[in-house]
UniProtKB/Swiss-Prot annotation:
Keywords: ATP-binding, Cell inner membrane, Cell membrane, Ion transport, Membrane, Nucleotide-binding, Potassium, Potassium transport, Transmembrane, Transmembrane helix, Transport. InterPro entries: KdpC. GO terms for cellular component: plasma membrane. Part of the high-affinity ATP-driven potassium transport (or Kdp) system, which catalyzes the hydrolysis of ATP coupled with the electrogenic transport of potassium into the cytoplasm. This subunit acts as a catalytic chaperone that increases the ATP-binding affinity of the ATP-hydrolyzing subunit KdpB by the formation of a transient KdpB/KdpC/ATP ternary complex. Pfam families: KdpC. It is found in: Cell inner membrane. GO terms for molecular function: ATP binding; P-type potassium transmembrane transporter activity. The chain crosses the membrane at residues 7-27. It is a single-pass membrane protein. The gene is kdpC. Belongs to the KdpC family. This is Potassium-transporting ATPase KdpC subunit. The system is composed of three essential subunits: KdpA, KdpB and KdpC.
Length: 201
């Protein structure tokens, strides 16, 4: 019986060593050599301190900063561990809302967001990505239109000329990946960091 089991054990050990040890180590080593920044999380630093990742959105709420898309991520309720509470951009619990288009809770949330955005900028149509959450709840990007929509609010809050803020948006537009994948986009963290360097007029 041991004779019949031996080939199975040999294959098990060989494949475990190959796929569980050799392959992961080779891929990790290759990533560290070829793409060290990406392999380590595309971390963003300011004055030597890590302040975020270019791949994970943050919950900017101040009028002085550009805001990202709505986020449906949650966290455990400290008062009752069987329930959850909203926790926008919680990277430990990436998720969408799973609310269907006819769900009243979704309609109410979108209406509240629309009303707030229209009060902030009554002149321009509200870009769709400012009222729709991404599937992960962690999208670090918004459309150039969503960034430009927020220019008047940010300029007012910072005492900057709208033209200066608009130029910052235009300078931070990322093109389609490889020139054809996806849409032009703006990384909210990168834009807000550029904004912090701008001087009041």
């Amino acid at each position: 019986m041991l004779k019949e089991l031996r080939p199975a054990f040999v294959v098990l050990i060989a494949l475990t060593a190959l796929t569980g040890l050799a392959y992961p180590l080779a891929m990790t080593g290759a990533a560290q050599v070829l793409f060290p920044r990406q392999a380590n999380g595309s971390l963003v630093t300011r004055e030597g301190t890590v302040i975020g990742s270019a791949l994970i959105g943050q919950n900017f709420t101040s009028a002085r900063y550009f805001h990202g898309r709505p986020s449906a991520t949650t966290d455990a309720d400290p008062a009752d561990a069987t329930k959850t509470i909203p926790a926008p951009y919680n990277a430990a619990n990436s998720m969408g809302s799973n609310l269907g288009p006819t769900n009243p809770a979704l309609a109410d949330r979108v209406k509240a967001d629309l009303d707030a955005l229209r009060a902030e900028n009554p002149r321009d149509p509200v870009p769709v990505d400012l009222v729709t959450a991404s599937g992960s709840g962690l999208d670090p990007h918004i459309s150039p239109e969503a960034a430009l929509f927020q220019v008047p609010r940010v300029a007012r809050a910072r005492g900057l000329n709208e033209g200066v803020v608009r130029r910052l948006v235009e300078e931070n537009v990322e093109d389609r990946t490889l020139g054809l994948l996806g849409e032009p986009r703006v990384n909210v963290l990168a834009l807000n960091l550029a904004l912090d360097k701008a001087r009041p007029q």
